[in-house]
């Protein structure tokens, strides 16, 4: 830990201990005074005097008693009793019981506050010990097998990056030329090249681009990438706080920029250290440990080129000269003429095709690239394959980044894509008869990219030789792996021959630049959209087109020197009459999103084998937690987020059956972790607390209540699915059946309208919509026969508003149906929360579920008063995210 952080930790620890000691003093004092009050009360033989004694003591020792309406009312009624016999003996007994319950409730609150503080102390002490065991530049291996896997990772990395793979630039250019077969497309390509060249040269020739603003954006962007050691993160954070430092850094980097053509690594005799470092998600990846100023410099360059590429290519594909946006064959002039005659108006584009196009451009196309210099700093553009098990420069066992610093909107991009693929597959299968889905990714993509391919593509798209020359030097980095793993024979720095640095902006720029041409290849040859999140790839549509697209992707990979990861490649062919020729051209293997798999029936099901393996891994992780709070955080990180994401977000395209599968999976997981039907998570935690602290009388609410109300915030995974379960149909086929019925009703109504036209009206319509050239489209016989249903419905994608509604509906997520709020609980919440709407639906469910017990035993809805808790240390330790260890 950095010295400043350590000093802060020690200060907070000292303050925490002081607060805990003060709490213990208050608790002891309260219990002593309470005991004296009750003892004094027992000395009184008459009931009135006893109640009066307890009342006086309550007002003395109970915080806020003088403002407690119930206490004040009892005081008034006791005065009334002296003069009015209507205040009966039984009523006095009730007053006594009420006052005693208030005293006992405060005792329980102080006891829970004491327990809470001890739990926090245990957590912070354990956390400090962990930090002391591992230096900032080291990595942990938990057993010999893990050490071997890490060694294997380093060996594979070394084998790939220092072994050149030469590709043929002429062959690449010729392959790309085939995407531009006519003059219009060549003109568009030349315009693209001109824009890229001029805009990139403007960046290259800028004067003094570094100032406080650009440095702040670049540094903040770096801090979101999880590529820096803790020490270097602290250095960058210190830069952001120091304007003098920013000014000096800007001066140095502007001098480097002025001599950009002569830039080099200048890494010295030892080169750039390369180390495997464990990320928050538990994966080990191979990182270059470059100089901080050099890192800022190249990060800025990469980000600016990302911005340029994204804006330019989005404009490029928006043109129909270049890109095929038709989800189905478009209307011909004959189709339009016939439609106009039979319907009585020209066709209007109300179908989902336009939305599908805008979704692709705005959400999925080049989604890895930041759109501006501040995008990364603002939390935009990052994507990581949450359940990746074999990828670039990494080794893991399948755990995803449950606490990785990725904004919610961008964590959800894969969920939105899942719904998109599920919807289009469902529609294609049910309405059009058959569908196929293809999934793949590229093996060691960023690590193994041939440099010759990079330069060929940069040249083809219009980057000047100045930029290509810069990247020749940048990619040929002198990497030193001598300290990457134990027992390595020192060989000194070696020049990188393949690949780009992981997670840098340059990787985004180069990686997306290369794969843009795969997007283009698929679209130009088949009209399909390649849904791609970096190098994770999905196709869906007609089986023949999917097979053709897969062949085109393989041709692209061959010419560019890329390789598909066969362990993550597969397809599903859904049809009542599978064509063996088409099937043989599709890749073998399953199609999965997280733990959801597309089965041969077309349903998305939870892969229980994967779940079981991860539950076993979770149990190992939980068993290694050395504090109760760490156990809860690990549980929340996995159960509350990781599994929630990998099971897929409930949606209309999955139906209620999917929610029931999620609930069944959670139940099976808890049975596996805590014993089949014999234990629960709260029983397990009670046993932990009793064994460590000797406390057993703990309400369930303490575990599940949110921290704002004095709880530990334990996640109950069943609540989130229950919030939406009743907002879904049992099967998504119900939505399609409803659409088909409405579509047929609409067709029959239009047919009826046409049949009721007089002959004169038909003649008038024919004259109105048919030119001399178009009159051949409708024969004399057809003038009196309404168009067939197949012809009328052929253009759903472009012209059906009903189909648009179905397409949007299937991708919707259901509205949460929260628990009904009672006045009693709402009033209690208002007494302790400045805004009761700050609780989300899940928290409200929990609060109401346990409110009767809490209100009865704790005198309100809050379990522990915040003033008794060491909130500073809570905030500090919560900043440290859960890091998975059992992952190799």
Pin down the residues of each PLM region.
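Active-site-adjacent bridging/hinge elements
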Residues: 267-278, 425-430, 472-494
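Non-catalytic, polymerase-adjacent accessory regions of viral genome-replication enzymes
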Residues: 1-353, 733, 739-888
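Short, conserved non-catalytic motifs in the polymerase core
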Residues: 275-295, 488-510
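Active-site and adjacent loop segments of nucleotide-processing enzymes
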Residues: 562, 579-888
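Active-site-proximal segment of RNA-dependent polymerases
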Residues: 290-291, 295-440, 444, 841, ...
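Active-site palm subdomain of RNA-directed nucleic acid polymerases
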Residues: 509-552, 556
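Short, conserved secondary-structure transition motifs
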Residues: 476-487, 570-585
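Catalytic palm subdomain of template-directed nucleic-acid polymerases
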Residues: 451-454, 459, 538-558, 606, ...
């Amino acid at each position: 830990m950095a010295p400043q952080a350590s000093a802060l930790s020690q200060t907070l620890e000292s303050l925490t201990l002081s607060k805990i000691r003060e709490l213990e003093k208050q608790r002891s004092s309260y219990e002593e005074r309470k005991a004296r009050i009750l003892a004094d009360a027992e000395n009184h033989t008459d009931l009135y005097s006893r109640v009066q004694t307890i009342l006086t003591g309550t007002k003395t020792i109970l915080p806020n008693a003088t403002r407690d309406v119930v206490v004040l009312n009892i005081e008034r009624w006791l005065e009334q009793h002296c003069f009015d016999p209507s205040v009966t003996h039984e009523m006095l007994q009730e007053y006594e019981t009420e006052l005693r319950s208030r005293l006992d409730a405060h005792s329980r609150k102080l006891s829970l506050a004491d327990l809470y503080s001890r739990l926090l102390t245990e957590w912070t002490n354990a956390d400090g010990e962990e930090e002391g065991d591992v230096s900032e530049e080291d990595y942990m291996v938990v057993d010999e097998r893990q050490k071997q896997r890490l060694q294997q990772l380093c060996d594979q990395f070394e084998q790939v990056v220092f072994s050149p793979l030469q590709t043929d630039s002429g062959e690449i250019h010729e392959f790309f030329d085939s995407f531009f077969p006519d003059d219009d497309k060549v003109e568009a390509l030349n315009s693209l090249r001109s824009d890229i060249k001029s805009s990139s040269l403007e960046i290259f020739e800028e004067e003094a681009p570094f100032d406080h603003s650009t440095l702040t954006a670049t540094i903040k962007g770096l801090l979101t990438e999880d590529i820096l050691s803790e020490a270097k993160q602290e250095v960058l954070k210190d830069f952001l706080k120091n304007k003098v430092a920013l000014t000096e850094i800007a001066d140095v980097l502007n001098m480097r920029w002025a001599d950009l053509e002569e830039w080099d690594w200048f890494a010295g005799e030892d080169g750039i250290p390369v180390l495997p470092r464990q990320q928050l998600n538990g994966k080990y990846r191979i990182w270059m440990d470059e100089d901080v100023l050099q890192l800022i410099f190249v990060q800025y360059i990469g980000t600016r080129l990302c911005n340029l590429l994204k804006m330019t290519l989005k404009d490029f594909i928006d043109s129909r000269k270049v890109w095929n946006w038709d989800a189905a064959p478009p209307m011909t002039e004959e189709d339009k003429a016939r439609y106009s005659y039979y319907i009585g108006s020209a066709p209007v584009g109300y179908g989902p095709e336009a939305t599908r196009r805008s979704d692709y451009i705005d959400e999925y196309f080049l989604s890895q690239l930041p759109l501006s210099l501040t995008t990364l700093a603002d939390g935009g553009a990052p994507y990581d394959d949450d359940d990746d098990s074999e990828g670039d420069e990494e080794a893991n066992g399948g755990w995803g980044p449950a606490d990785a610093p990725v904004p919610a909107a961008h964590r959800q991009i894969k969920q939105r894509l899942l719904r998109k693929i599920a919807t289009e597959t469902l529609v294609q299968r049910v309405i059009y008869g058959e569908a196929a889905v293809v999934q793949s990714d590229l093996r060691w993509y960023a690590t193994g990219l041939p440099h010759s391919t990079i330069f060929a593509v940069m040249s083809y798209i219009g980057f000047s030789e100045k930029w290509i020359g810069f990247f020749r030097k940048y990619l040929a980095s002198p990497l030193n792996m001598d300290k990457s793993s134990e027992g390595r024979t020192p060989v000194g720095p070696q020049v990188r021959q393949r690949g780009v640095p992981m997670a840098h902006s340059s990787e985004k720029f180069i990686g997306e630049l290369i794969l843009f041409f795969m997007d283009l290849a698929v679209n130009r040859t088949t009209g399909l959209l390649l849904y791609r999140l970096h190098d994770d790839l999905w196709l869906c549509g007609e089986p023949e087109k999917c097979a053709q697209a897969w062949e085109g992707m393989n041709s692209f990979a061959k010419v560019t020197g890329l390789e598909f990861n066969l362990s993550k490649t597969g397809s599903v062919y859904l049809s009542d009459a599978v064509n063996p020729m088409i099937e043989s051209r599709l890749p073998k293997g399953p199609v999965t999103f997280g733990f959801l798999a597309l089965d041969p029936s077309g349903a998305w099901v939870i892969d229980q084998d994967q779940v079981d393996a991860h539950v076993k891994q979770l149990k190992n992780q939980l068993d290694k937690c050395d504090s109760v709070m760490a156990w809860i955080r690990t549980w929340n990180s996995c159960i509350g987020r990781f599994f929630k994401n990998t099971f897929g977000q409930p949606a209309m395209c999955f139906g209620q059956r999917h929610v029931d599968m999620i609930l069944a999976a959670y139940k099976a997981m808890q049975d596996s972790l805590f014993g089949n039907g014999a234990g629960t998570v709260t029983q397990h935690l009670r046993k932990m607390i009793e064994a460590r602290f000797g406390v057993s009388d703990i309400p369930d609410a303490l575990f599940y209540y949110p921290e704002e109300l004095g709880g530990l915030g334990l996640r109950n995974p069943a609540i989130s699915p229950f919030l939406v379960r009743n907002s879904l149909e049992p099967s998504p086929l119900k939505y399609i059946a409803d659409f088909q019925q409405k579509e047929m009703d609409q067709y029959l109504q239009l047919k009826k309208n046409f049949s009721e036209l007089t002959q004169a009206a038909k003649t008038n319509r024919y004259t109105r919509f048919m030119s001399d050239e178009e009159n051949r489209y409708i024969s004399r016989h057809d003038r009196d026969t309404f168009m067939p249903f197949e012809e009328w419905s052929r253009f759903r994608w472009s012209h059906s508003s009903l189909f648009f509604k179905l397409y949007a509906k299937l991708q919707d997520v259901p509205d949460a149906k929260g628990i009904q709020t009672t006045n009693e609980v709402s009033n209690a919440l208002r007494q302790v929360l400045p805004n009761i709407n700050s609780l989300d639906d899940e928290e409200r469910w929990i609060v109401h579920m346990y409110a009767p017990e809490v209100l009865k035993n704790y005198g309100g809805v809050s379990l522990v008063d915040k003033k008794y808790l060491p909130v500073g240390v809570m905030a500090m330790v919560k900043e440290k995210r859960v890091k998975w260890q059992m992952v190799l």
